[in-house]
A protein has these predicted regions:
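N-terminal secretory signal peptides that target proteins for export/translocation
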Residues: 1-2
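Sec-dependent N-terminal signal peptides
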Residues: 5-13
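C-terminal segment of classical bacterial N-terminal signal peptides
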Residues: 13-24
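Generic detector of short alpha-helix boundary/capping microenvironments
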Residues: 14, 32-33, 104
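Immediate post-signal-peptide N-terminus of mature secreted/exported proteins
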Residues: 25-56
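Compact alpha-helical subdomains of small soluble proteins
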Residues: 29, 58-129
């Protein structure tokens, strides 16, 4: 795993970051940190939708973060598809639920910023050689 990319993600998530889990990554291609990266992918998808809904004016920041994760990890085939599916699942879950920015949406954003940052730090600390 490329540590530089995770460090960048930690910095981008900003030290502050639900939804239902998407299907698990195929066992024969899974790395030991894939569960964390899958959850991070889902969080990035959720933030991509919710931050835009709440007027953050960040454009495609969270989609770009997902692309940075994919570029750093360079997964192929099923593993790549699973990360993308998790991102899309996070996005769609909130698209179906939130049509305007509410206090609850703001709370979800704060919690996801915290959780995403925590996942990125833990994966980096545990698997960075």
């Amino acid at each position: 795993m490329k540590i530089r990319a995770l460090v960048i993600l930690i910095m981008m998530v900003g030290g502050v970051a639900g939804g239902t889990a998407a299907p698990a990554v195929a066992a024969e291609q899974a790395a030991p940190f894939d569960a964390g990266l899958a959850r991070l992918s889902e969080i990035l998808g959720s933030l991509h939708y919710l931050r835009g809904l709440c007027g953050a004016n960040e454009g495609n920041k969270w989609r770009a973060e997902m692309q940075a994760l994919l570029d750093a990890e360079a997964p192929s085939g099923q593993r790549r598809a699973q990360f993308i599916a998790h991102f899309n699942h996070g996005y769609r879950a909130y698209l179906q639920t939130y049509h305007s920015c509410t206090p609850a949406a703001g709370l979800v954003i704060r919690r996801y910023l915290e959780e995403g940052s925590k996942i990125a730090r833990e994966v980096t600390a545990r698997y960075s050689n």
